[in-house]
Swiss-Prot record:
Tree of life domain: Eukaryota
One Pfam match: Paf67
Protein name per UniProt: Eukaryotic translation initiation factor 3 subunit L
GO CC term, one of those recorded: eukaryotic 48S preinitiation complex
Source species taxonomy: Eukaryota, Fungi, Dikarya, Ascomycota, Pezizomycotina
Role according to the record: Component of the eukaryotic translation initiation factor 3 (eIF-3) complex, which is involved in protein synthesis of a specialized repertoire of mRNAs and, together with other initiation factors, stimulates binding of mRNA and methionyl-tRNAi to the 40S ribosome. The eIF-3 complex specifically targets and initiates translation of a subset of mRNAs involved in cell proliferation.
Subunit composition and interactions: Component of the eukaryotic translation initiation factor 3 (eIF-3) complex.
Protein's cellular compartments: Cytoplasm
Entry keywords, A to Z: Cytoplasm, Initiation factor, Protein biosynthesis
Amino acid sequence: MSYQTGMAPARAMEDDSDVEEEALVADYREQVQYSEGGMEEMDQATLAQQADEIQSRLVQASQPLDFQATLETKFASYDNYCALFHYILNSEGPVDLEPPTYYWAWDVIDEFIYQFNTFCTYRARIARQAGNEEEAQILRDNPNTWGCYSVLNVLYSLIQKSQITEQLAAMKRNEDPMAVAGPYGSKNLYRMLGYFSIIGLLRVHCLLGDFSLALKTLDDIELNKKAMFARVMAAHFTTYYYVGFSYMMMRRYADAIRMFSHILIYVSRTKNFQKNTQYDSITKKNDQMLALIAICVAFHPTRLDDTIHTALREKYGDQLLKLQRGGPDSLPVFEELFKSACPKFMSPIPPDFDKPEANIDPIDHHLSVFMEEVKTNMWSPTVKSYLRLYTTMDLKKLAGFLDVKPEELRSWLLVSKQRTKQLRWTENGLLEGEPVNVSDLDYALQGDLIHISEAKMGRKLVDWYIRNLSRTYA
């Protein structure tokens, strides 16, 4: 079983990719119907035949840890993961085991990173509070338990052992991936763990704040319906969330909106085919995605899909208006939405238990970085509202309207103009892209004279009617 079906070359996701979305929905519907039938019977038979200690560990590794788990239980869970991955990676030759279920590999990587994240958050909280000396001492004596290096080492080792990057590269060249898979990569267990470890690295690097490296990890994975992650709903959602958030923190707002919009539309179209437990867990994240879209739209005004636009107005209508108006009143709204929708950032190193005041909350750190960008663009809506009224305007006159010094306004105009030039992803690596002007308002400074031009795009009514008619009569 390969991770991407077919041998078609890479193709970029278009803005109005309704055909792509419908294909994803149809593909997911078939998978759900299949998994609810013979797949469950096959999984039960497999588990019944392989009920030994290792097989039990395989099943246990994908089970969520109780939210109220004690520190001892968290340590034991880490030891179990270490034993399992040591057996898989360091045995003499590839282990002859089949994954218990189709979704097992994703569940294991997902739970492994989740426990790592929650443990780091818990450890940082104990260090800041400095109230529970007994637990603080245990954590102080075990700095390598759930350490960042250990987790990254597991993920990179699974990728290297499975030769998954070589397999994906071969598939892009329309070659046989099994020719480069090696003895480990030819096994389902290693191939699936290696593949989802790439998605796991995207997540971990984003949680650590290295957004460029997070996107770089997906160089060998194509963001389309043929990708393996698109067949596992939770993996699909996670991938686009972290890619979109990384783009947002890199100020590539147009690309961030595309990623968030894609997955929200997909979720809305597949909700009738979701199993209740899976859908409930994903819909809890929908509000976060909408909050991030609201932030991105404030920086980069653009048209949204009708489904997203309606949901955004219903959930964040008042906040969106404040964001779009800009000014000091928008700052608390930006802060509120960011803190409610951002990942649970963590530090790559253990906290200092002896100096609690020296420990900085990673979320507060990234919030401060983000708010600096917000403050830079805070007056953008107001300035643009004046510029739209003129074709030429004196710099000092505009500074008088805004009650700022001319040189401060000049600096702001130069920074704002630079922000309108962004990379827009089309194909190949996610860090690559074509430079485009993402604003319909452009201007140039000639001494103290501002030359202004505005490009007004007419709405494509024909496309709008066709799209809505197809939805109505489908």
